[in-house]
Amino acid sequence: ASDMGVELELVPTDWKSIVAGITADKYDISTSASLSPKRALVSGYTNSYFKLATVPLTLKKNLDQFQSWDDINQSNVVVAVTLGTTQEMQAKTYFPDAQIKAIESPARDFQEVLAGRADAHITSNVEAATLVETYPELAIVPVEEPKSPTPLAWLIDQDDQVWINYINHWIELKKAQGFFDGLMNKWNLKSL
């Protein structure tokens, strides 16, 4: 906003209606969103500026039970997801034999794990690093490798080419100036 000389206005939303907010012109740009062909049918995306992947989390005390993706894909395992997220779709694919428990925002999937109402949940490697630091009772399951490497971008109006061009040029300029690298260092993040 400061680069454009405008005032930032934050508009509350949730994941299940983030695309609808763009298409209904409730806001001009979203927070980071993983690229999704389904979303791209109705909303525009900026160029990507970061890549992440999906990892599972559980309670540290349950790590002896969960060492792989297959360990989680069991009929007696409950996997919590936040309704409307990419992880909700991924969980249904990764864990067809597990019980998928979709949580309505503002509640969060990891809270179900902390409360003992779910055995695991999946999230980005970025959020996982923050969660295990914030909640020491959580742990990242030491899977062979993360799944679904995914670029992040911002959702925008697909019919506004001037806005799309402006944001894409801004992203390119900020990449060249090290802005995104600085953010990654500040928040101890690693892009894939």
Where do the PLM segments sit?
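Short loop->beta-strand "edge-of-pocket" segments that line small-molecule binding or catalytic clefts
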Residues: W69-G84
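Short helix-loop capping/hinge motifs at secondary-structure junctions, enriched
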Residues: K61-S68, K101, D159-N165
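Acidic, polar ligand-binding/catalytic clefts
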Residues: S2, E7-D71, A139-I140, E144-K147
